[in-house]
Design a protein with these regions (language model features):
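N-terminal leader and targeting sequences that precede the mature domain
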Residues: 14-18, 25, 37-41, 46
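Intrinsic disorder/low-complexity detector
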Residues: 1-16, 24, 51-119, 148-158
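Mixed-charge, glycine-accented linear interaction segment located at domain edges/termini
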Residues: 38, 42, 48-56, 122-158
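Short aromatic-glycine-(Arg/Gly/Cys) micro-motifs in beta-strand/loop hairpins
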Residues: 19-35, 114-130
């Protein structure tokens, strides 16, 4: 397993350390190789929002759509990218922290989002405990994979 984990690399790789799973809700931390501190999340919606914010901050993978609305509402504030390089341009110069060895209390997933197109994400999700890699073509499918794998651990029908 360690050999397969050591080969797991992407500049936008996010680790999802699941510490608690109950009734389809996940709680844990998001980690990445460019920051030593983790970002806590409380539920799947919070997880998705924080992952989206991280991708926007990196400007990678680039999104193909922007939020819009016909009525006034609180607008999502995209991180200020003025004067900053995109992640692929600066990844070689950033300090990197090891994340592959970190584990969640219940489960660990590493997510490589390759594209953010058609208002959703596409990529691969790697389940550390099962040594399994699953492709996903939408955020919903990614969440379904995570839920299925977590229910498998609890002995529920997947």
């Amino acid at each position: 397993m360690e050999n397969q984990l050591e080969r797991l690399y992407a500049i936008d790789l996010l680790g999802i350390l699941v510490h608690k799973y109950q009734d389809g809700q996940l709680e844990g931390e998001i980690i990445h190789q460019y920051k030593e501190e983790s970002t806590p999340f409380f539920g799947v919606l919070d997880l998705i929002k924080k992952m989206e914010f991280q991708y926007d901050e990196w400007d990678y993978p680039q999104t193909s759509t922007r939020d819009r609305s016909f009525r006034k509402r609180e607008k999502y504030n995209y991180p200020n990218r003025k004067g900053k390089k995109r992640l692929p341009d600066e990844a070689g110069t950033l300090e990197k922290f090891p994340i592959i060895q970190k584990r969640g209390k219940q489960s660990t997933f590493f997510i490589h989002t390759k594209y953010r197109q058609n208002a959703t994400w596409q990529g691969d999700i790697f389940r550390v405990e099962e040594e399994a890699c699953f492709p996903f073509k939408s955020v919903l499918r990614m969440l379904q994979i995570m839920d299925r794998e977590m229910r498998k651990d609890q002995g529920e029908d997947a």
